[in-house]
Amino acid sequence: MRFFRRKIAIIVILAYAIFSLYAAYNVFFSKRVISRVHRVVKKGSVIIETGKAGEKEWNPWEEDERAHSVVVQKRRDAFRLYRDQAAKNRPKTYKVQIWGKAAIGLYLWEHILEGSLNPSDKSSQWREGEIQSGKIHFSFYTGPAVVQGHVPPDTDSVVLVLNGREQQKISYSVQWLQHVQSLIQARTISRVAVVLLGNEQCNNNWISPYLKRNGGFVDLLFLVYDSPWVNDKDIFQWPLGVATYRHFPVVTLSSQMVKKDRPYLCNFLGTIYKNSSRESLMNLLKQNNMEKDCLMHAREKWLPQETSDTSRQYQMALAQSDLTLCPVGVNSECYRIYEACAYGSVPVVEDVLTPGACAVGNRSPLRLLKDAGAPFIFLKDWKELPVILERERAMSQKEKTERRMRLLEWYSSFRQQMKDRFTEVLEENFFKIT
């Protein structure tokens, strides 16, 4: 029994010793293994450990991925640079509205700027159009329904087309100027130009107070006839153009118009006033028995509107004549000059000054046309006409065709010059573009 107890005691002591040795080994020699469930994570330790683990891991595609990222970034930078450069080089567009409250507005829009109108029906109450010229986007409004306060202003720059030929027209024009002045005071618009059909004797003092040079608000004035005001700084001369108020069309050129033999040497269809240059011209034609060579139709009373028949008759006369006789009226510049050019019929112009306050000098009258090198026939007295017609009879058809072509090319070039000049003056003065 005693032996059995001693054996048990030895086993217990031996087990204790083995356990003690095992515990000592784990404490001093074995690595710690901390359970993920129970371990305490200190702030920032995960980031540090992850970073260290990442450093130890080897990625065989790491260099390729880095190179691809560099290429993608370069492409993005190149596209961004291209986009910025394109935006910088893209021409800036400026907006200008034209309010046509006189018939010469149609000459400006359709014949000079070569814009179209919608609707095309000339009797429409409201017509409008848009066109780009230079850096300016023009929008045009005309017709009886275009009244004060009903034009949608989408810009602060406006060109107003007015008629200042007689008192009734002046009163109407003043109303529009006062309306524009109220828009300036309301800061709706800030830049204004006026295209004015001036008085035929150049008496335009009524508009002077509205000019900015005199304390008004009109920055620029484009003025018809040889006014002494013209300085090519803020006042510019503007062509009279064709009679758009009589619906004179934009003439489309054809080879037949240029090359075809015309049956008449000259034409004159118009109103004959007592004791006028026109009366002297008609008497001269009759005395020299030129009625067969020249297509003539005279009337005693001026009519503001033509019928479709008289309008067609007039245009046919221009198209069938080598020359168009242009006697002076109240002013030397008349619609007939421009209408003859449109049909390639050389204007024979009476080059004399008329009474009034228009400019006097070597370049007047018809200063604008002469400066542009108009290929017209100028005469001081209608007594020179028989010699001119005799010279015409001696010309060959080839010579007449070449002269006709030169006239048509000149008139096209003249209108282009007016378009460029009008656009450039607005660009420089409204938007400071040089």
From Swiss-Prot:
EC number(s) given by UniProt: 2.4.2.61
Catalytic activity: 3-O-[Rib-ol-P-Rib-ol-P-3-beta-D-GalNAc-(1->3)-beta-D-GlcNAc-(1->4)-(O-6-P-alpha-D-Man)]-Thr-[protein] + UDP-alpha-D-xylose = 3-O-[beta-D-Xyl-(1->4)-Rib-ol-P-Rib-ol-P-3-beta-D-GalNAc-(1->3)-beta-D-GlcNAc-(1->4)-(O-6-P-alpha-D-Man)]-Thr-[protein] + UDP + H(+)
Membrane-spanning segments: 8-28
Pfam families linked: RXYLT1_C (PF24785), RXYLT1_N (PF24786)
Extracellular side: 29-434
Phenotype of null mutants: Embryos display mild to severe hydrocephalus and significantly reduced eye size, reminiscent of pathological defects in Walker-Warburg syndrome.
Domain of life per record: Eukaryota
Intracellular or extracellular location(s): Golgi apparatus membrane
Membrane topology field: Single-pass type II membrane protein
Single GO term (MF): ribitol beta-1,4-xylosyltransferase activity
Cellular component terms (Gene Ontology): Golgi apparatus; Golgi membrane
InterPro entries: RXYLT1-like
EC category: transferase
Biochemical pathway: Protein modification; protein glycosylation
GO biological process, one term: protein O-linked mannosylation
Key word Aminoacyl-tRNA synthetase present: no
Residues on Cytoplasmic side: 1-7
Main location: Golgi
UniProt keyword list: Golgi apparatus, Membrane, Signal-anchor, Transferase, Transmembrane, Transmembrane helix
PANTHER family with a match to the protein in the record: RIBITOL-5-PHOSPHATE XYLOSYLTRANSFERASE 1 (PTHR15576:SF1)
Family: Belongs to the TMEM5 family.
Function field: Acts as a UDP-D-xylose:ribitol-5-phosphate beta1,4-xylosyltransferase, which catalyzes the transfer of UDP-D-xylose to ribitol 5-phosphate (Rbo5P) to form the Xylbeta1-4Rbo5P linkage on O-mannosyl glycan. Participates in the biosynthesis of the phosphorylated O-mannosyl trisaccharide (N-acetylgalactosamine-beta-3-N-acetylglucosamine-beta-4-(phosphate-6-)mannose), a carbohydrate structure present in alpha-dystroglycan (DAG1), which is required for binding laminin G-like domain-containing extracellular proteins with high affinity.
Protein name: Ribitol-5-phosphate xylosyltransferase 1
Lineage of the organism: Eukaryota, Metazoa, Chordata, Craniata, Vertebrata
